[in-house]
Amino acid sequence: MTVVGEAYLPLGDRDFTATVQRILDSGADCVLNTVNGTSNLGLFTALAAAKVDPAKLPVFSTSIAEDELRSLVPEQVRGHYALSCYFQSLATSANRRWIAGFRDEFGFDRVTGDPMEPDWCLVHLWKQAVEKAGSFETEAVRQAFRDGLSYAGPGGTVRLDPKTQHTTKFFRIGRIRGDRQFDIVHASEAPLDPDPYPQIAFPGWSVDWTTDGITRGPEVTIDGDV
């Protein structure tokens, strides 16, 4: 895989006309979209205006979930993709029960999504640690974390890694549907281990909360067009 270009725009920017033209001129086969928040509306509006066909130039977004799709135009995003650990359309009994309970509490029109599901799991992992420690004190709870707790969540069973204090996660790719939901087109066979400081991005950095915590390497800089 070759990266043929990259661009960084201010958070909240809505004008992506020039950026989309650069994408088209680059000859890219796909787009990795790390845009956040309302800027996604500007990006997909510009893509639609340029008549970008997701079958020929798909966009893979890292921060679009079901709730974000409620504010986007279905015709502009249908056929593009999201990279995520959880989708509401996951067809498991645990997920269906969770969605039903969520809708009973907040209404049938509300949706679940990836930003929400790990929070649910983490609260339950913290609860396990508190019960195991028999205390709310921070150090006692951290000590309980060292036993490698796990929780069967809506997106699958996750395990807390004592060294990083991050959890294992499934990886999934979803294709956006016209009803603002996702068809899951790929899923990892097993949960992936956490890697909060990948060496390609954080050379020399590491973390081990069972010993010395975070080991810092060189300060990270971003090279690219602004």
What kind of region is each of these model predictions?
Residues 1-226:
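Extracytosolic ligand-binding ectodomains
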